[in-house]
Amino acid sequence: MAELVYTPVIELFQLVWKGLDIQFQFEGQENLPTKGGAVIASNHVSYLDFAFIGTGAIHTKRFIRFMAKKSAFDNKIAGPLLRGMKHISVDRENGNASFVTALKALRAGEVVGIFPEATISQSFEIKGMKSGAVRLAIGAQVPIIPTVIWGSQRIWTKGVPRDFRRKSVPIHIAYGPPIFLAKDADVESAEIDLKKQMVSMLHKLQESYPDSHVGERWAPQRLGGTAPAPAIEG
């Protein structure tokens, strides 16, 4: 079925990335499935994470349906685009409805993107994660693709003015090997294992990042940056 909204939006994003001279580096793209359902579980450091992560999946010719807050769908400009791209609205007062919608999409062979932290991490460390990604993967019996992104927070993140004038920002994204969970898998244990995997992947991305983190607002204190500490971030 033709994607009347998603396809032109992707093409527009690609023009924007070219104009900003984004320096993409993708790792593990071979782990992205070319068919069948899958859960993309990613850390969250920027308002543009979904667009960058989707860019890395273009070669698979798959369209990731991201789960996003209901408030984004209520926006007069973003709302129609999000609905047209078949992203999934998450109403925190009725979370079960969005879970069921995502589950149906996965069982129909769609790729669903989710940020288990639920909100942007202002410390840029991976915070406590909710169990949605694990429960969806178990319920639909599809793999989880652990994913991490680094650098996108330098353009537009929570609590810091966006800067679309910044050019040639390195944005690194890694897609990990698929994680398959049995129907009777323990959700809590699987969630802990997923977080450990994502933290390890993120640290590796940060170690290979070409720009220094020292003294930078977009970098965590662990790396010498000046972002809020995890315990006090708003």
What is each model feature region?
Residues 1-18, 23-34, 104-107, 166, ...:
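Membrane-interfacial terminal anchoring regions of lipid-handling membrane enzymes
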Residues 33-94:
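Catalytic core of membrane glycerolipid acyltransferases/transacylases, capturing the structured
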Residues 56, 81, 104, 135-139:
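Hydrophobic/aromatic ligand-binding patch that stacks against planar heteroaromatic rings
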Residues 87-93, 97-109:
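Helix-adjacent hinge/juxtasegments
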Residues 105-133:
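Catalytic-site beta-strand/loop segments enriched in glycine and acidic/polar residues
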Residues 124-186, 220-221, 228-229:
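A cross-family acyltransferase "interaction/gating" segment
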